[in-house]
From Swiss-Prot:
One Gene Ontology MF term: chorismate synthase activity
Lineage: Bacteria, Bacillati, Cyanobacteriota, Cyanophyceae, Oscillatoriophycideae
Keyword Metal-binding: no
Entry-linked InterPro entries: Chorismate_synth, Chorismate_synth_AroC_sf, Chorismate_synthase_CS
Encoding gene per record: aroC
Protein name: Chorismate synthase
Length: 370
């Protein structure tokens, strides 16, 4: 239960951190989409461990294999299976966690629910599960880009109390990828790297915020009431490990404004398109995309597994202490950027297919544009 995401573009992830490998089955991808391993591998390389001095030292190439659904470089319209083998697992590092629960991790809750758990690296609660999401996101990005030139750019906005100054309307992927922390504000990025290294040396961890902007979004994605676009985006990104908050557009800051201050006034541009003067709605109104940029932010807590000794209990309820071993990120933010982008792409791709299935079967004129 809970391993499948989406309606028409359906993603099913499988595998565990220290098992044979992890992967994904993607159902509902349109046929004849040109896709190759290199495009998927590019996104996985942005997510993989061991990529810099501020990420987990676990050495995994995360080399992907496409096992089905693609023939001669094109999708078949049938389920696509992508597989990544685990090659640097060290289950012995987690022996203490077989009997001791990590504070603020999924150990105790998994035991409470299932009565059994894979304590080697956390099993399904490990961030290695997100490999399948990022691989799926690469395909979703390709569909969105081909349809209307959709561009999704995520970046680290804040780590602990260090906040970058970034204009989301102009930020580029090149700026994001110019440093190991994936923060387009180069001056702030240097401070962030220093902070993460300092915290890591103390055996501790830090959290922060990833901001994501989506450009060239088609109008009309999303549905009223239960399937609002922002609700599905929230579900998608909040299903990622370590997430603790979500906001879109003005978010919580909008609560300090009056209606006249917050409303996005309308105008007609030179092409006759209805546009908004401001974008406090974050590109979505009434649960439906309005064609403006979608801007969202996701809060990530500090990594739960740390070397610093903390009080906990055993499976038998006995009070004890745990200084976690193993290899873990002192800050998940740099590797979380492609994860957020992937979930945003999956949600938008799913809604694009749903929109066309409902609204373009019988063509009709729409006064609000295409």
């Amino acid at each position: 239960m809970g391993n499948i995401f989406g309606h028409l573009f359906r993603v099913t992830t499988f595998g565990e951190s220290h098992g044979g490998g992890v992967g994904v089955i993607i159902d509902g991808c349109p046929p004849k989409l040109e896709i190759n391993v290199k495009e998927i591998q590019y996104e996985l390389d942005r997510r993989r461990p061991g990529q810099s001095k501020i990420t987990t030292p676990r050495k995994e190439s995360d080399t992907c294999e496409i096992l089905s659904g693609v023939f001669e470089g094109q999708t078949l319209g049938t389920p696509i299976m992508i597989w990544v083998r685990n090659k640097d697992a060290r289950p012995q590092d987690y022996q203490d966690m077989a009997i001791k629960y990590r504070p603020s991790h999924a150990d105790a809750t998994y035991d409470a629910k299932y009565g059994i758990r894979n304590w080697q690296g956390g099993g399904r609660s490990s961030a290695r599960e997100t490999i399948g999401r990022v691989a799926s996101g690469a395909i979703a990005k390709k569909i969105l880009q081909q349809y209307s030139g959709v561009e999704i750019v995520g970046y680290v906005k804040r780590i602990k109390n260090l906040e970058a100054i970034v204009d989301p309307t102009t930020v580029t992927m090149e700026q994001v990828e110019s440093n190991i922390v994936r923060c387009p504000d180069s001056e702030c990025a240097e401070k962030m790297i220093e902070l993460v290294e300092k915290i890591r040396d103390l055996g501790d961890s830090v959290g922060g915020v990833v901001e994501c902007i989506v450009r060239n979004v088609p109008k009309g994605l999303g549905s009223p009431v239960f399937d609002k676009l922002e609700a599905d985006l929230a579900k998608g990104v909040m299903s990622l490990p370590a997430t603790k908050g979500f906001e879109i557009g003005s978010g919580f800051a909008g609560t300090t404004m009056t209606g006249s201050e917050h409303n996005d006034e309308l105008y007609t541009d030179k092409l006759g398109e209805i546009r908004t003067v401001t974008n406090r709605s974050g590109g979505i109104q009434g649960g439906i995309s309005n064609g403006e940029n979608i801007v969202l932010r996701v809060a990530f807590k500090p990594t739960a597994t740390i070397r610093k000794e903390q009080r906990t209990v055993s499976r038998q309820g006995e009070e004890t202490f745990l200084a976690a071993k193993g290899r873990h990120d002192p800050c998940v933010l740099p590797r979380a950027v492609p994860m957020v982008e992937a979930m945003v792409a999956i949600v938008l791709c799913d809604h694009l297919l749903r929109h066309y299935g409902q609204c373009n079967t019988l063509k009709s004129e729409n006064v609000y544009g295409n």
